[in-house]
C-alpha cells in the first residue's frame, strides 16, 4: 500500500485535474449555446435557398447548371476534412479522420488529396495522405465572408479541372451528446431530386431563369460549406462539454476512492503505532 504522502499527492493532483475539467465543461457549455444559436438561425435560409434552386432547376434543361453540374470521369478527388484546432473533445476529430481515410480507400487507384479545415485533421492526415492546404485560421473569425472565400477556392479548383469531384466531411450537430459524421458531395452538383411538388406559379424572371440558377449555385455552395463548418463548430463544443463532464465525473470518483484509501492507510498507521506503544509498555512491565 502506498504511503500517506504519496496518496495525499495523488488526491491533490486529481483534485486539480477535476477543477480544470469542470472549468472547461462550463466554458464549452457557454460556447455551445452561441454556436447552437448560430446554426439554428442559418438553417431556414439554407433550406429556403435549396428549395428555390430545386424549383428553378426542375423546369430547366439538365445542363443549365453549367460547369457546376458537369459530370467528368473521376480521376482526381479532393476531400475537405473539417475538424477542430483543439483536442479534448472525445472522438470528434477521430471520427472525421477515419471517414476521410475510408474515402481515400474507396477511391483507391485515383489521385486523392485532402483540403484540411482544422489543425487536428491536418496534423494526422498529413502523415499518410496528401494535404494540399490547411485553412484552420477560419475558426479565429468564423464569418460567412471568410468561409465564402474558401468555398470560392474549392469551386475554382473544380471549374479549372484540377479535380473531378470534391467532397466535404464534417460532424453534423444534433445535440450536445450526439454528432453524426456526414459526407456530402460538394461538386459537381448532384442531380436535384425532391419529393416535394415543384412550384409552377406564373413568375416573370429578370434576368432569365438560367442566369438566376447560375447566380444561385455559387451562393448555395458557399452556404453549404458555411453550414458544414458551423455544424462542426457546434458539434466540437458539444463533444468537448460531454467529454469534460465525463472526465470530471471520473476524477470525482477517483478522488473519493483515494480518500477512502488514505483514511484506511491512516487508520492502519495509527493502529500500528498504538500496538507498538502497548507492546513497549508490556515489555517494560516484564
UniProtKB/Swiss-Prot annotation:
Pfam families per record: ATP-synt
Name listed for the protein in its UniProt record: ATP synthase gamma chain
Bilayer topology term: Peripheral membrane protein
Gene name of the record: atpG
Subunit organization: F-type ATPases have 2 components, CF(1) - the catalytic core - and CF(0) - the membrane proton channel. CF(1) has five subunits: alpha(3), beta(3), gamma(1), delta(1), epsilon(1). CF(0) has three main subunits: a, b and c.
SUPFAM superfamilies found in the cross-reference section: ATP synthase (F1-ATPase), gamma subunit (SSF52943)
The keyword Electron transport is assigned to this record: no
Keyword Metal-binding: no
Location, primary (coarse class): membrane
Function: Produces ATP from ADP in the presence of a proton gradient across the membrane. The gamma chain is believed to be important in regulating ATPase activity and the flow of protons through the CF(0) complex.
PROSITE patterns assigned: ATPASE_GAMMA (PS00153)
Sorted UniProt keywords: ATP synthesis, Cell inner membrane, Cell membrane, CF(1), Hydrogen ion transport, Ion transport, Membrane, Transport
GO MF: ATP binding; proton-transporting ATP synthase activity, rotational mechanism
Entry's Gene Ontology cellular component terms: plasma membrane; proton-transporting ATP synthase complex
Family: Belongs to the ATPase gamma chain family.
Compartments in which it is found: Cell inner membrane
Transmembrane segments: none
An annotated GO BP: proton motive force-driven plasma membrane ATP synthesis
Family matches, as InterPro entries: ATP_synth_F1_ATPase_gsu, ATP_synth_F1_gsu, ATP_synth_F1_gsu_CS
Amino acid at each position: 500500500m502506498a504511503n500517506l504522502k504519496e496518496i495525499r499527492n495523488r488526491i491533490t493532483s486529481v483534485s486539480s485535474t477535476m477543477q480544470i475539467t469542470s472549468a472547461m465543461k462550463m466554458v464549452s457549455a457557454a460556447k455551445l449555446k452561441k454556436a447552437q444559436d448560430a446554426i439554428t438561425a442559418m438553417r431556414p435560409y439554407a433550406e429556403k435557398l435549396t428549395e428555390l434552386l430545386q424549383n428553378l432547376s426542375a423546369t430547366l434543361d439538365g445542363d443549365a447548371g453549367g460547369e457546376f453540374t458537369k459530370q467528368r470521369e473521376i480521376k482526381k478527388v479532393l476531400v475537405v476534412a473539417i475538424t477542430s484546432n483543439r483536442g479534448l473533445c472525445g472522438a470528434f476529430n477521430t471520427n472525421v479522420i477515419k471517414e476521410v481515410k475510408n474515402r481515400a480507400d474507396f477511391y483507391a487507384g485515383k489521385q486523392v488529396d485532402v483540403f484540411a479545415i482544422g489543425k487536428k485533421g491536418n496534423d494526422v492526415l498529413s502523415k499518410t495522405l496528401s494535404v494540399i492546404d490547411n485553412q484552420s485560421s477560419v475558426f479565429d473569425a468564423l464569418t460567412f465572408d471568410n468561409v465564402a472565400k474558401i468555398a470560392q477556392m474549392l469551386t475554382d479548383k473544380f471549374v479549372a479541372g484540377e479535380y473531378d469531384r470534391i467532397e466535404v466531411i464534417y460532424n453534423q450537430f444534433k445535440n450536445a451528446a450526439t454528432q453524426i459524421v456526414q459526407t456530402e458531395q460538394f461538386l459537381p452538383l448532384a442531380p436535384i431530386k425532391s419529393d416535394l411538388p415543384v412550384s409552377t406559379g406564373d413568375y416573370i424572371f429578370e434576368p432569365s431563369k438560367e442566369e438566376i440558377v447560375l447566380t444561385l449555385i455559387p451562393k448555395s455552395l458557399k452556404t453549404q460549406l458555411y453550414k458544414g463548418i458551423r455544424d462542426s463548430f457546434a458539434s466540437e463544443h458539444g463533444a468537448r462539454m460531454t467529454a469534460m463532464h465525463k472526465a470530471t465525473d471520473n476524477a470525482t470518483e477517483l478522488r473519493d476512492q483515494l480518500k477512502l484509501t488514505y483514511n484506511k492507510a491512516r487508520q492502519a498507521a495509527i493502529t500500528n503505532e498504538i500496538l507498538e506503544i502497548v507492546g513497549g509498555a508490556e515489555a517494560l512491565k516484564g
